[in-house]
């Protein structure tokens, strides 16, 4: 499965770009907000969500782990697939979504093309607890780690990623805290690499 692509934007279209990676072109679908930040001929790093079906493989790209996380979160709602999730993220940022759900503001979602009253109600109802957990977890992590350059939701994703790579939760949180204390503006990618490097050097 493809988790990340680093390459040059060869061409762009209404809902996807072709990313050239060492001469191989990958079609990557993305939200309008992400596509607006990608310029042809420039190189970018995209976090990838790979969807495999019997007749095709689709790649969905994101400039942040936070957007990728909400892409998957939205699809947990009955009636929302990849296309609708991207449509919502084309209009609303992850922070917008969190605020709307916390405020039970269905009208924010109803204003999006393809989202009717019933779907807007399901989004608020089905994601209420999940977003509340993200918000409380992110706030706790932000307070304990004093994060400056990385958003709270993204930091939570980093810790989850490290746990999936074999860290205990305690090890992951301590590793992130130590690294960010030394370099508050470190990128997410570099943060993960440094944590893995430090852990391997201790064995």
From Swiss-Prot:
Localization = Cytoplasm
One GO biological process this protein is involved in is: DNA repair
Q: Name one Pfam family in it.
A: RuvA_N
Q: Where is this region: Domain I?
A: 1-63
**One GO term describing the cellular component:** Holliday junction helicase complex
Stretch list, region Domain II: 64-142
For this UniProt record, the keywords arranged alphabetically read as follows: Cytoplasm, DNA damage, DNA recombination, DNA repair, DNA-binding
Transmembrane segment boundaries: none
Task: Identify the stretch(es) annotated as Flexible linker.
Answer: 143-149
GO molecular function terms noted in the UniProt entry: ATP binding; four-way junction DNA binding; four-way junction helicase activity
Family according to the record? Belongs to the RuvA family.
What is recorded about the domains?
Answer: Has three domains with a flexible linker between the domains II and III and assumes an 'L' shape. Domain III is highly mobile and contacts RuvB.
- NCBIfam families of this UniProt entry? ruvA (TIGR00084)
The protein's role, per its UniProt record: The RuvA-RuvB-RuvC complex processes Holliday junction (HJ) DNA during genetic recombination and DNA repair, while the RuvA-RuvB complex plays an important role in the rescue of blocked DNA replication forks via replication fork reversal (RFR). RuvA specifically binds to HJ cruciform DNA, conferring on it an open structure. The RuvB hexamer acts as an ATP-dependent pump, pulling dsDNA into and through the RuvAB complex. HJ branch migration allows RuvC to scan DNA until it finds its consensus sequence, where it cleaves and resolves the cruciform DNA.
- Subunit structure of this entry? Homotetramer. Forms an RuvA(8)-RuvB(12)-Holliday junction (HJ) complex. HJ DNA is sandwiched between 2 RuvA tetramers; dsDNA enters through RuvA and exits via RuvB. An RuvB hexamer assembles on each DNA strand where it exits the tetramer. Each RuvB hexamer is contacted by two RuvA subunits (via domain III) on 2 adjacent RuvB subunits; this complex drives branch migration. In the full resolvosome a probable DNA-RuvA(4)-RuvB(12)-RuvC(2) complex forms which resolves the HJ.
Protein name per its UniProtKB record: Holliday junction branch migration complex subunit RuvA
Organism of derivation? Rickettsia bellii (strain RML369-C)
Q: Which gene encodes it?
A: ruvA
């Amino acid at each position: 499965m493809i988790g990340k692509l680093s390459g040059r934007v060869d061409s762009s279209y209404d809902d996807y770009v072709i990313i050239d990676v060492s001469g191989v072109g990958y079609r990557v679908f993305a939200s309008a907000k992400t596509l607006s930040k990608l310029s042809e001929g420039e190189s970018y790093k995209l976090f990838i969500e790979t969807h495999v079906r019997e007749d095709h493989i689709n790649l969905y790209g994101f400039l942040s782990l936070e957007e990728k996380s909400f892409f998957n979160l939205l699809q947990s709602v009955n009636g929302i697939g990849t296309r609708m999730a991207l449509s919502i993220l084309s209009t609303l940022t992850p922070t917008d979504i969190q605020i709307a759900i916390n405020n039970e503001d269905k009208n924010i979602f109803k204003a999006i093309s393809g989202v009717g009253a019933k779907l807007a109600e399901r989004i608020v109802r089905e994601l209420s607890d999940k977003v509340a957990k993200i918000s409380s977890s992110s706030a706790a992590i932000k307070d304990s780690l004093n994060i400056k350059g990385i958003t709270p939701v993204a930091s939570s994703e980093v810790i989850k990623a490290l746990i999936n790579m074999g860290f205990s939760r305690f090890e992951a949180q301590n590793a992130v805290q130590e690294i960010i204390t030394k370099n508050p503006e470190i990128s997410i990618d570099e943060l993960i690499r440094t944590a893995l490097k430090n852990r391997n050097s201790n064995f």
